[in-house]
Amino acid sequence: MEHKEIRGKRVILREQKEDDAEFFAYWFNHPLIMFQCGFTEPTDKEKKIKYINEYHKTEDSVWFTITDIDGSVIGETGLLRMFPAWHCTDLTIIIPDPEKQNKGYGTETIRLMLDMAFNEYKMNRVSIGVVGLNTDALEFYKKIGFRQEGIQEQGYYYNGEYSDFIMMRILREEW
C-alpha cells in the first residue's frame, strides 16, 4: 500500500526508496539494534532493497522512511498486519542512531502514525510488541499512551539470552 508524504514539525514520513537501504543496512547490523528490534540475522543493502520493493509494498501495510526536516534519513516506521475488518493494526518504529534519539523525532512520528491509523484507516486498535529488556522503549510507549496488555514469557531469544516479549496497545478512545 503506497501513501503520500506526511510532514510534521520535526520529521517527514516519505515513501521508502532504494537509496535508503544503505542507511538501514548499516544500522540494522549493530548488535544493540538487532537485539532491541528483534532482528535474528544481519542484513545487507540488497536484502533491504528487496524488503523496500517487495515486503514493504503489500496491501496490508504502509511503510515510511523517517527523515528530519532537512531530509536526512533517521529511521523507518510502518503500520503492518492491517486488518480493516477488525479495525486493528500493528505499528513499528525504528530510530537506530543514538544521536537522533530523545530529540522528539520518535514522539512526533508515533503521533503522525496514530493519527493516520485512527483517522484515515479508521482503526480502533493499534498494537506494538517490545522486547522486555528494552526498558527505554517500554517507557517511551507508555508515555505516548500505550498500555501493556500481555507478556509472552521468554518469547524472545537473542544471542543466548531469553527475554519476555511485551504486548502493548492503544485504542482510538484513548487517543
Where in the sequence are the language-model features?
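Acetyl-CoA-dependent GNAT
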Residues: 41-99, 171-174
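Conserved beta-strand-loop-alpha-helix junction that forms the acyl-donor binding cleft
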Residues: 128-138, 155-159
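Conserved GNAT acetyl-CoA-binding A-motif
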Residues: 119-129
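Terminal substrate-recognition subdomain of acyl/acetyltransferases
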Residues: 1-2, 161-175
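A short, well-structured alpha-helix characteristic of acyl/acetyltransferase catalytic modules
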Residues: 1-50, 174
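Conserved active-site tyrosine of GNAT-family acetyltransferases
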Residues: 141, 146, 168
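Conserved acetyl-CoA-binding loop-helix of GNAT-fold acetyltransferases
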Residues: 102-116, 139-143
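Glycine-rich acetyl-CoA-binding "A-motif" of GNAT/NAT acetyltransferases
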Residues: 72-75, 136, 162
